[in-house]
């Protein structure tokens, strides 16, 4: 069994991954910005880790000990039109979703490289391969994350470190409700914002995604990109078949 460090394990997908991996007998190191939120998880170790804070990352990596697998899951969402989204919010989003992931990778990768083995698993999104309006800042952070992950596959793969990107579609967590939204009452983009529900399509559970992550970790030769569930598979297949001559939308917009 592997020793697995999970970021953002306090709720949603991260929490489900911790429970699934612990149930399969792996040594699980669950981390979150507020470690008290991890108290009831059936894991081996619970650590404070803020992926946006270098000292916090360094401390957690040291306390965790030898790590075979990193599951990079910590993330958040911002909803706003690109015309008016506060750039400070976009910067914060990238610090968490993108740079935070790389920060933790830089903490665990040297030991993996020296051992000649290890796994880096990134929880991304179908929005790392296609663009949705209003949630574009989130998608941009995931596009960047996937570029980093693919680069790591080319670089660290030479030393025996395997990289995978798990891509869920819409997931039944409170992530959407918790997203920071920036709209005024007379915002000209409100009609588009109100159509976002139609873009969600079929929804999978956090537990569904956790099973995909665990199965990926346990595969001897995992693929680079792993759609999490049939809805994600359909969405990504449709995007792949679509022309690049025009912006792609999975459903027609009427606003």
PLM region spans:
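The beta1-alpha1 cofactor-binding region of Rossmann-like NAD(H)/NADP(H)-dependent oxidoreductases
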Residues: 49-59, 87-88
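SDR active-site lid
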Residues: 158-223
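Conserved glycine-rich cofactor-binding loop
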Residues: 10-11
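Active-site-adjacent segment of SDR/Rossmann-fold oxidoreductases
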Residues: 130, 151-162
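A short, exposed helix-loop element centered on a Lys and neighboring polar residues
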Residues: 105-106, 150
């Amino acid at each position: 069994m592997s020793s697995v460090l999970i970021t953002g394990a306090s709720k949603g997908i991260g929490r489900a991954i911790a429970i699934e991996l612990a149930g399969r007998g792996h040594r699980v190191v669950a981390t979150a910005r507020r470690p008290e939120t991890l108290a009831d998880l059936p894991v081996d170790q619970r650590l404070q880790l803020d992926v946006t804070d270098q000292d916090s990352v360094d401390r957690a990596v040291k306390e965790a000990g030898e790590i075979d697998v990193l599951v990079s899951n910590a993330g958040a969402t911002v909803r706003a039109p690109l015309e008016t989204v506060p750039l400070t919010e976009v910067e914060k989003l990238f610090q968490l979703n993108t740079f935070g992931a790389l920060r933790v990778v830089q903490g665990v990768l040297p030991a993996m490289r020296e051992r000649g083995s290890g796994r880096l698993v990134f929880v991304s999104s179908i929005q790392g391969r296609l663009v949705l309006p209003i949630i574009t800042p989130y998608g941009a952070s995931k596009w960047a994350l996937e570029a980093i992950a693919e680069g790591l596959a080319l670089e660290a793969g030479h030393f025996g470190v395997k990289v995978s990107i798990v891509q869920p579609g819409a997931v039944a967590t409170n992530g959407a409700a918790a997203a920071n939204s920036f709209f005024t009452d007379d915002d000209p983009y409100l009609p588009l914002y109100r159509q976002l529900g139609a873009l969600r399509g079929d929804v999978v559970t956090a537990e569904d995604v956790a099973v995909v992550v665990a199965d990926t970790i346990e595969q001897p030769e995992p693929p680079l990109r792993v759609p999490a569930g049939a809805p994600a598979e359909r969405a990504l297949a449709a995007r792949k078949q679509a022309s690049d001559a025009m912006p792609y939308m999975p459903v027609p917009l009427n606003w």
